Amino acid sequence: VTVQADTVILRMLNPELLANHEKAAAALAGADVAVAAMRTSLASQLLDQQAVQARATSDWRIAEVKNQAYERAHVAGVISALALRESRITEEQQHRRADIERQRVAASRQNMAAQLRAAQARSDEVASTLAIAQQQVAALDVRAGIDGI
């Protein structure tokens, strides 16, 4: 029988190393699934927050249009100064609310990115553990150093 350099000539077994390799492979699969699940969950939360922002912006725009109509009606003497003031206050409140919701969406995006980076870092750590386990298992193989018989 001839062998070439780097041919496996003896395969040793170490049940502990093999078990560690299997555990690391399973942990990596779990970590990857966790990252994907987190990404989906956070994207859904972001969409919910964006829907709230859209509603707040819509409410503000409606209040803005109503306030403009109230201003014209007040100039024409159709509504009181009190009704106009209430309309202005409502518009200001809705504007502030829309701004807050916009800030929340921005904060949600930053939070989402940070959480995903952390989850990916955990996954990368597990991948590193798996790579080490693979190297340890591969080191159990005795290979020919040169071509021979």
Predicted regions located by residue number:
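Short, surface-exposed alpha-helical segments at coil->helix boundaries
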Residues: 64-67, 81
